[in-house]
């Protein structure tokens, strides 16, 4: 939304803040690359080039792990989550998927069978209630942040959903933005996994 369309005139009175204090430079770069040159909107009717931003923090480069099958991805995720839980508070770890279907069909049963304490953040569940690692959709994690984020099931069938992939245009760009936002929920580490055919947004 351009602010002047809402009756708010800020031209000549606004400043651009180019420093990211939440996530690392390595995660910021990966997430920005997902946007593939898409310009940002500075809310004043002008375009804002995202490459001008930078983070003060540095850390590990995001990892993208591709697997042949869901079973192989599942084994990796359980190992990775258990490893993270050895040094991190479980509440600071979030497994994120594009859809509720993925979470309910694949990842909730996976964590239950592995005996990993977890909390499913649906639309009615506060993120601060209960212990265990968090599970949420990409939409649900908007506005939240976690030390460690695992973006799971980033496959061609789900990211973007088939109808949106076929439509292209603004809908496809919105999916890029959604993946960008989900990735930048991570403060320290970002791990992206997929199985079968990877999402075209990862290329």
Protein language model annotation of sequence segments:
Residues 1-179, 189-198:
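Conserved helicase motor core of SF1/SF2 NTP-dependent helicases
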Residues 200-203:
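A conserved SF2-helicase RecA2
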């Amino acid at each position: 939304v351009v602010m002047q369309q809402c009756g708010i005139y800020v031209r000549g009175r606004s400043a651009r803040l180019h420093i990211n204090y939440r996530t690392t430079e390595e995660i910021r770069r990966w997430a920005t690359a997902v946007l593939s040159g898409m310009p940002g909107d500075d809310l004043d009717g002008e375009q804002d080039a995202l490459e001008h931003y930078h983070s003060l923090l540095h850390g590990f480069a995001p990892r993208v792990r591709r697997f042949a099958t869901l079973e192989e991805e599942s084994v990796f995720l359980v190992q990775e989550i258990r490893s993270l839980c050895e040094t991190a508070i479980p509440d600071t770890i979030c497994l994120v998927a594009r859809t509720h279907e993925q979470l309910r069909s694949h990842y909730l049963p996976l964590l239950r069978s592995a005996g990993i304490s977890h909390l499913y953040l649906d639309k009615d569940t506060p993120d601060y209630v209960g212990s265990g690692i968090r599970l949420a959709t990409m939409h649900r994690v908007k506005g939240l942040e976690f030390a460690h984020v695992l973006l799971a099931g980033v496959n061609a069938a789900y990211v973007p959903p088939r109808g949106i992939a076929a439509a292209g245009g603004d809908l496809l760009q919105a999916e890029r933005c959604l993946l960008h936002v989900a990735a930048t929920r991570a403060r320290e580490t970002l791990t992206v996994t997929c199985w079968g055919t990877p999402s075209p947004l990862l290329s």
